[in-house]
Amino acid sequence: MKYYSTNHQVSPASLEEAVVRGLAADRGLFMPERIPTLDRAFIDGMKHMTFHEIALHVASAFFGDDMPQSDLRRIVEDTLAFDTPVVPVTDTIYSLELFHGPTLAFKDVGARFMARMLGHFIARRGASREVNVLVATSGDTGSAVANGFLDVPGIRVFVLYPKGKVSAIQECQFTTLGRNITALEVDGVFDDCQALVKSAFVDADLNAHLQLTSANSINVARFLPQAFYYFHAYAQMDRIGRAQRLVVSVPSGNFGNLTAGLIAHRMGLPVSHFIAANNRNDVFLDYLHTGLYRPRPSVATLANAMDVGDPSNFARILDLFGGDHAAITALISGSRTTDEEIRATLADVVRTHGYTPDPHGACGYHALMQRGLQPGETGVFLETAHPAKFLDTVETATGRSVEIPERLRAFMQGEKRSVPMARTFEAFKDYLLSQA
């Protein structure tokens, strides 16, 4: 399958080219030339299938023509070495827990898949030239990518993160690894980090000296595999007879997660409605209300992984719907959750239902409560990170202690190593060239 740019100014690329390049030469995001439709027999039969079987079927629809089935199966099985269970919170609302991977965040799925697919292409090329992965993080992406790519031959990873704007636990997950992982502590906000990464891809001098790619959700090998757990969630709900009229609430920052859900829906997954759950960075909610996309500087919130003022994947959503605002608003609504509402939601869900979300999951739950569920509807919110990653916020809001998983404790015992970085592209470019 070929992959075209959302800016439509360059020729379509092969899967390998799209994965290795990350961003198209015209600064657009790659999209599959066609979105395969999965037949109803598969959808109805998923409740009898394992997560691996479901994911392999979905992966084959996109990637099956570009790599041997045996290699794709290995990548899927290596990626999904953990489950993504659906857990009841109330009689009508369920949590899709995406934090059971190595770094306790949903991004483990996409990051591990991309690391293995990129490694496959590098090995197939027999390339002697090292591939440099650039990734901007507002929280969980950095840890998921760093751990997914750790010690993968032929790959170096540079994680750009905003100084003082990720939690201490998140920071230690990518600043303590060393080896082929370098953390760059940028004096700015996430949008500055993302702008540096995008600028690097279109800089002729850098690309002449370094093979660059991205592991943010702008990379097709990062965001497309996130469709796997939407199908798996539906299968789990179908097993208990609750799959009809699903309303799925997606905590949204850079919108890769929501885009993956929309791709799954276009492939035939019967979701009735999506909610884009925003924090105070609500440019998408503004777009839904006005039809105008007006990016603005991000503001810091308790749900820091969603602190994005110019989400990259908006381009993919717009492209997916052909720019049809009415079609977008028919399927997707939005919500806005303030820090005060995050704290109140955390306290209420723990006290009333005995379930502990993280601040991002709290936004997803709050969005469902804001919209309300009609008779016959069932709500599912994506619980994107383990609450222990936001210990101070969760414990202060709920008045209860959160147990820290052992694998998270191991990260916390490491020594921080990071490189201070100005937010200017000149400083970033000079640093990368010094590493060539």
Regions found by a protein language model. Name each.
Residues 1-436:
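PLP-dependent amino-acid enzyme catalytic core
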